[in-house]
Amino acid sequence: MNAAPTVLQQQAQSLSEAVTQPIPGSRKIFVQGSRADLQVPMREIALTRTPTLFGGEENPPLSVYDTSGPYTDPQVAIDLAVGLAPLRAHWIAERGDTVALDGLSSSFGRGREHDARLDAVRFPARRLPRVAREGANVTQMHYARRGIITPEMEYVAIRENQRLEAVTDASLRKQHPGEAFGASIQQRITPEFVREEIARGRAILPNNINHPESEPMIIGRNFLTKINANIGNSAVSSGIAEEVEKLVWSIRWGGDTVMDLSTGKHIHETREWIIRNSPVPIGTVPIYQALEKVDGRAEALTWEIFRDTLIEQAEQGVDYFTIHAGVLLRYVPLTAKRVTGIVSRGGSIMAKWCLAHHKENFLYTHFEDICQIMKAYDVAFSLGDGLRPGCIADANDAAQFGELETLGELTKLAWKHDVQTMIEGPGHVPMQLIKENMDKQLRECGEAPFYTLGPLTTDIAPGYDHITSAIGAAMIGWFGTAMLCYVTPKEHLGLPNRQDVRDGIMAYKIAAHAADLAKGHPGAQVRDNALSKARFEFRWDDQFHLGLDPEKAKEFHDETLPKDAHKLAHFCSMCGPHFCSMKITQDVRDYAAEHGMDDAQALSTGMQEKSAQFLAQGAQVYRPM
């Protein structure tokens, strides 16, 4: 490392205030686990007292799931050039089944490490990777199948419960019954239940042993619905500092995992900066980087190049790999009559390779070799849907479902090696065909977690595909999808900027939460109930703070009612002071209380009084001023 900080290191000394300031109205809290070093972060939203007019009771703070890591904690000094604290390092080391290497195993990684020309963009702190001891398997699935509850499993159990036991107000606990379509929704998540779900293959806990900075989370249909955000540079846009900032921006608004899809310069170095500063799991599509190593010529790819890329990324700490092993030679002709053919970048790369060599996909033929690498680092499979439909006309065709059947076959093979696995799904699917996708995935893949891109429910809205896809995402999340991959307004049009990322995440947080409500996930409705109570009581700041995007809510309110006094007003800009339905309802309740009646009696009596008053004034609709 150079003695003087590089330009990149200077940029990385701090992030912009917009992505590191605390989220309005809340603070970071930590829930203590069974051991001193197991503290689970949550976001506690402070609530104000109910106005005397509405009863005057205290409203206790509400805890919610938090993906933002230490970036929203004012007690933590952030230095991107150092990276985050290795939260899980001791848990990994104490298991005694891994060893620290003397250096990188990947030939590409070693070459980058010794290239002085990269000093200006290299992550400053050198970290030696770990790997499983000879003959060991270090996956969370392996531990789970041996009856071991790891600290990571306890961590996610605490996290999923969101301190629901602290909510004692029965009105906040009220919840409509859900329809879970056969899912095993629990009233309370226990560490043992987490272990059982991972052992069964119905959930994954993606935590590479070389990403100790990550805060454990779980993906499975019996848990909260998660969302993924994509970032990554390209040959024409964005540098390392911008990508790290996009990472932090993504998790601030609720990204549960982030995929680095970089295809431009310095892919290796960009990924190192991202992983060292990420409190959430990081996923990649290794074939993208492998293609860069052969100058973009798909036919020049080899198993040896791909294998070296897997090891390179596993030793950096990538938590899950998208592997397009289901794109088989026999399926490629099935796409010929499609409207949009093969739209997956990874799928098209492997299809081109298969056709160029007229051989079976080497990711398929070497699948068990890949499993050996995955279990040595605890990298999870995200089995890619390389033949997903790129328009609703192509939905649910033979190519898509043929690949899905192969992914089911590969899932069972991965499970034989105790490798955690989830399945990627479409794509573009009209609403009436969505459930068929979910049902077939559950059947073919043994209930392994489904991870879907949308699906987009119509093709006519370029610029608004975060909406067209959030509709499908809410539906498929309700039917059983475990994680939803966000779509931004720039989908099909260009690379997203920071605002596009925020808009995409918000659309998908809404979809995921709507799915949890529909499934009947325990406590899912508490936040809705708390916000509704705040709305009825005109606690404006509490309404903002309980929302998914407090800053946007306040910004919209302030456009028409900017004064501080308006935060105490018993009306909003939509109806004004005289036509607010909630104010009228409260007036009825006050009248009832004053006259010892129930609400219905008060409304009837009040109407009679108003009728008499109207007649006494001459029964004129319009009175002269």
Curated annotation (Swiss-Prot):
Keywords: 4Fe-4S, Iron, Iron-sulfur, Lyase, Metal-binding, S-adenosyl-L-methionine, Thiamine biosynthesis, Zinc
Coiled coil: none
Pathway field: Cofactor biosynthesis; thiamine diphosphate biosynthesis
GO biological process, one term: thiamine biosynthetic process
EC identifiers of the protein: 4.1.99.17
Keyword Metal-binding recorded: yes
Enzyme's top EC category: lyase
Protein residues bound to Zn(2+): H428, H492
Cofactor binding, per record: Binds 1 [4Fe-4S] cluster per subunit. The cluster is coordinated with 3 cysteines and an exchangeable S-adenosyl-L-methionine.
Binding residues for substrate: N230, M259, Y288, H324, S344, R345, G346, D385, G386, L387, R388, E424, Y451
NCBIfam families found in the cross-reference section: PRK09284.1 (NF006763), PRK13352.1 (NF009895), thiC (TIGR00190)
Subunit field text: Homodimer.
Family of the protein in this entry: Belongs to the ThiC family.
Protein name: Phosphomethylpyrimidine synthase
UniProt lineage: Bacteria, Pseudomonadati, Pseudomonadota, Gammaproteobacteria, Lysobacterales
